[in-house]
């Protein structure tokens, strides 16, 4: 942990008393908001007068070019976004361990996509949405603020980037780390910092809360901080009972009765637009509205094109950890630029937030900006890592002396774009890597991690509908047993272990069962 500041904890002079965060999935800035430059020329996006392109081959100076268009579909395939794929997208060549890093030319998106699927670059990776296709974002960009310099925290996939949102580190993970996921990631989070300084937080989940990737969040003391979104969020807004820090987790599984609204390809962006609309309208109607900052951001770019070079100089390693062989990643460069919207009655219409003014000359907006902003606005006692100490803070966007009274009460309506046949078919689709990680975390809560099938075969035969039911059942059971244990007065630092009850009269454990039992044990 970074050394504690001398200011101590307590409230600041900021008018913001509640920060609401929604982290969506796998879209780049240019893909979602690049064409919004047509609405506001100050946005660093794309335009027809300055066309952007990538070559089919970066090694051929005479290569044909694929130009960035505005014909993205609501339901897209899922491009490559592994560490290796991102390296090629950013630097225009396959991974090498060069030091220092080469110049990030952002010219390898087409080459990488074509190696995966012929035609994917022109139809998917090099396409974006025009503003009229994303009417909720269109109104929010015009009415509030867009940040055109927010990068993912590292050039990798969902899990490590989401870990930075609340902890300013992935604890050395730069891809799915199943062993650590079993134990629970051990790093301190901003949730503990808020609690220690007397502030409140709530996690409003829709399918499975990935905040449970952090080990501490599984403890009995935090069981009452988890709320079902559809049962609690609008009610808490209406009653003025939102906590100081609100985390909204979208639906990560697309089923017919409740389509996914996390914007992950192939999920329909209409569902994501409707989720943002629903959240905004509930916040706008709340008596707490004049004290709210609502942040919408995406965890990583998902393999979609973006033209702004990723920062490779002056990015601090958060905690001295280095990624595994063969890449030995030092966590010293950021990922690709992602969409970010900032919404509050304290923001002037049409604001564009560019690079931050400090705290360091190389500082950038990235996911660690969220805990950094919480620390600054709520005057928390200490930083979490060197990364949130370095990251830009969002308070600069609060650029008024009084709250606006003309903020829209409602946002545009969007029709759902899929029919019953498509929805049923998608319930039978294979799982994404992140969905598999959610299953693995759910298995630990349920006690299934002691079985020989964990983690490698547990999700093998699951489709989307099976997985959605599994994680919901696992969390419901874990949460219910945790509530009972807390009501019984058990140690607040305890984590309920459902495997004990299920194995009390079972046969002796196999080696694999013993191994995974060891992995989740603090000792």
Curated annotation (Swiss-Prot):
The gene is NPC3. Residues 52-64 have a biased composition (Polar residues). Pfam families: Phosphoesterase. This is Non-specific phospholipase C3. The keyword Hydrolase applies. It comes from Arabidopsis thaliana (Mouse-ear cress). It is an enzyme of class 3 (hydrolase). GO terms for biological process: cellular response to phosphate starvation; phosphate-containing compound metabolic process. Keywords: Hydrolase. Residues 44-64 are annotated as: Disordered. Its EC number is 3.1.3.106. The lineage of its organism: Eukaryota, Viridiplantae, Streptophyta, Embryophyta, Tracheophyta. Possesses specific phosphatase activity toward lysophosphatidic acid (LPA) in vitro. Does not show phospholipase C activity. May play a role in signal transduction and storage lipid synthesis. May be involved in brassinolide-mediated signaling in root development. Belongs to the bacterial phospholipase C family. InterPro entries: Alkaline_phosphatase_core_sf (IPR017850), Phosphoesterase (IPR007312). It catalyses: a 1-acyl-sn-glycero-3-phosphate + H2O = a 1-acyl-sn-glycerol + phosphate.
